[in-house]
Amino acid sequence: MRSSHKSFDFENSLKRIDSILNDSTSYEESDDIPDIDDLTFNNGKYVNCAAIFIDLRGSTDLIKTLGKLSKSLARLYRAYISEMVAIVNSFKTCKEINIVGDCVSAMFAGDIEGAESPVIEALQASSMANAMMNVLNVKYKKKWKDFVELKAGIGVAYGRALVIKAGFSGSGIKDLVYMGDVVNKASKMCGLAYKEYTSHAICVTKEVYENAGKYIANEEKKLTYQDFLTEKNHNTFGSVYVGNFHRVYINNWAEENK
């Protein structure tokens, strides 16, 4: 959000706090993530949604090696972010995309079953993002001969969130905020992929796994996404599911152009 300078008034601040804390608005259920302009600073909607987080691994080392070459680093990040955004943005149930540093996250929602359900489309985005990292590494290595391969951890969660509009009323500074475990869990799953589970790019919650058997991901072998996920028992999060599945045609390009 861009800043829009406005003098701070302490008395107005106290009034705003009291107004927010004493608000009695009830929150309704919704099949989809509302548009920010359809919300006020006093209401909100409960929505079932899937969240995906895609985060680079080894970016600290990357800054150390390419940090002095700021133009090179900028090109690398732009290429990575542009393609992760392009992937999640290609799905109908993707309703919001955020970029923070080298992490791209997105929210998927909609009362849709089958191939276009939020969970299935978030998993499809995961498979494409995983394969796209191989394509990017091919491109990076051709550009910088001594380039060390990059990896991205991908986390997906599904659950109920309260969506509210938050910001500073009257300033134009506003954003949607998702309250609930789904965003936090997706971030945590992302934090496990290619870190604690060093050989797995994708980590999802139990709720995602339970909804992953409703779509044939591999037509030839009649496999669902459940067939590409393996259960792990995590000390903090209980049952989580990890995998390395990827979109075949994207990955094939990377293999053929190494």
From Swiss-Prot:
Residue ranges of domain Guanylate cyclase in the record: 50-190
Chain positions recorded as Mn(2+) 2 binding sites: 55, 102
Keyword rRNA processing: no
Known catalytic reactions: UTP = 3',5'-cyclic UMP + diphosphate
Cellular localization per UniProt: Cytoplasm
Keyword Lyase: yes
InterPro entries found in the cross-reference section: A/G_cyclase, Nucleotide_cyclase
GO cellular component: cytoplasm
Enzyme Commission number(s) from the entry: 4.6.1.26
Binding site for a ribonucleoside 5'-triphosphate: 53
Disulfide bonds: none
Predominant location category: cytoplasm
Cofactor(s) named in the record: Mn(2+)
This protein's UniProt keywords: Antiviral defense, Cytoplasm, Lyase, Manganese, Metal-binding, Nucleotide-binding
Superkingdom of source: Bacteria
Subunit-structure text: Homodimer.
UniProt family annotation: Belongs to the adenylyl cyclase class-4/guanylyl cyclase family. Pyrimidine cyclase subfamily.
Role this protein plays: Pycsar (pyrimidine cyclase system for antiphage resistance) provides immunity against bacteriophage. The pyrimidine cyclase (PycC) synthesizes cyclic nucleotides in response to infection; these serve as specific second messenger signals. The signals activate the adjacent effector, leading to bacterial cell death and abortive phage infection. A clade C Pycsar system. The pyrimidine cyclase gene of a two-gene Pycsar system, weakly generates cyclic UMP (cUMP) from UTP, has little to no activity on ATP, CTP or GTP. Expression of this and adjacent effector GmPycTM (AC P0DV43) probably confers resistance to bacteriophage. The genes are probably only expressed in response to bacteriophage infection.
Protein name as catalogued: Uridylate cyclase
Organism: Gulbenkiania mobilis
Originating gene: pycC
